[in-house]
């Protein structure tokens, strides 16, 4: 799940809601629009970074979306031009919404590429949480990436990186199955798969800790249906999976109802701004609120 710290567009959107919505103002009395340092267009930043080129072993690319930042391409090309790229590992998170051919071409020049695939659900769940992403486009981009990896001469580490919240925990079983099917069907000598999920704790009302008993049971039933082989395939998944099961089986928090009311205000406000309805994206949405 992207946050206002990493997305200036989301920050601007939420701030525009806050300014006109009294319920939203009560939840967030202070601005939700964070100051933005335009580092990608700061020539001093890139000039300072170039001084370290002889010593670079691993470089972590950021964004917004790293595949859209021209400065990233320019710097990677410089590493290629000076002949050091074959000794460097590049690592970054991508929302998989935009895989340009130039991106695929340039990463092939590096020793290893570590990509964390920031996809938070399947189908409409992904499209709602990561609005305005399109599920079909994400699937097409993953296929494009895997076709490139298959014929590549360098090594790849691909890790699914969902952020699990009250919105998508009942979709996590489908997510695991979908991820496993992709990984199982695309096993190459130069490719290592993993899943490294995180749990959403903020805003607090999105934490699964505040789920209703009914919604917890729905999520538990689905998660316990996941085959063991699908979980064990990903080295980093088992402990997280157990953590989610334990949380869902625990007694829910005393302030859960109040947090669910805040969640509904949040979702309704964003839906109105975006002219969408959560019911059209998340089939179990009514069970979330209780």
Placement of each model-derived feature along the sequence:
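Eukaryotic beta-rich interaction modules
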Residues: 39-45, 76-78
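Catalytic domains of carbohydrate-active enzymes, especially glycoside hydrolases
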Residues: 48-52
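Amphipathic alpha-helical interaction motifs in eukaryotic regulatory proteins
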Residues: 76-77, 127, 143
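Distinct, well-ordered alpha-helical segments
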Residues: 73-76, 100-107, 171-173
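Surface-exposed alpha-helical interface segments used for non-catalytic interactions
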Residues: 70, 74-77, 136, 177
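Core AdoMet radical
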Residues: 2-41, 53-69, 82-101, 108-140, ...
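Short, acidic, metal-binding catalytic loop of nucleotide-sugar glycosyltransferases
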Residues: 78-84, 148
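Conserved C-terminal portion of the radical SAM core fold
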Residues: 91, 110-116, 136-289
């Amino acid at each position: 799940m992207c946050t206002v710290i990493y997305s200036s567009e989301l920050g601007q959107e939420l701030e525009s809601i806050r300014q006109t919505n009294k319920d939203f103002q009560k939840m967030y009395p202070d601005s939700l629009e964070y100051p933005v340092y335009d580092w990608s267009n700061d020539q001093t930043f890139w000039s300072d970074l170039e001084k370290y080129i002889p010593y670079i072993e691993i470089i972590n690319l950021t964004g917004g979306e790293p595949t859209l930042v021209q400065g990233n391409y320019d710097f990677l090309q410089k590493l290629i031009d000076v002949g050091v790229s074959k000794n460097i590992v590049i690592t970054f998170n991508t929302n998989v919404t935009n895989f340009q051919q130039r991106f695929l071409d340039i990463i092939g020049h590096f020793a290893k590429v570590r990509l964390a695939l920031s996809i938070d659900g399947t189908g409409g769940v992904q499209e709602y949480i990561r609005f305005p992403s399109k599920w079909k486009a994400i699937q097409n981009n993953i296929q494009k990436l895997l076709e490139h990896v298959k014929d590549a001469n360098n090594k790849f580490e691909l890790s699914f990186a969902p952020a699990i919240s009250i919105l998508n925990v009942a979709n996590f079983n489908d997510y695991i199955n979908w991820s496993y099917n992709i990984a199982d069907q695309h096993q190459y000598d130069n490719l290592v798969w993993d899943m490294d999920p995180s749990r959403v704790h903020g805003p607090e009302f999105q934490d699964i800790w505040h789920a209703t008993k009914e919604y917890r049971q729905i999520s538990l039933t689905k998660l316990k249906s996941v085959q063991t082989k699908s979980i064990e395939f990903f080295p980093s998944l088992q402990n997280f999976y157990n953590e989610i099961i334990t949380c869902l089986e625990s007694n829910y928090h005393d302030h859960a109802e109040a947090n669910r009311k805040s969640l509904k205000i949040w979702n309704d406000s964003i839906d109105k701004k975006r002219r969408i309805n959560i019911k059209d994206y998340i089939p179990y949405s009514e069970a979330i609120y209780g």
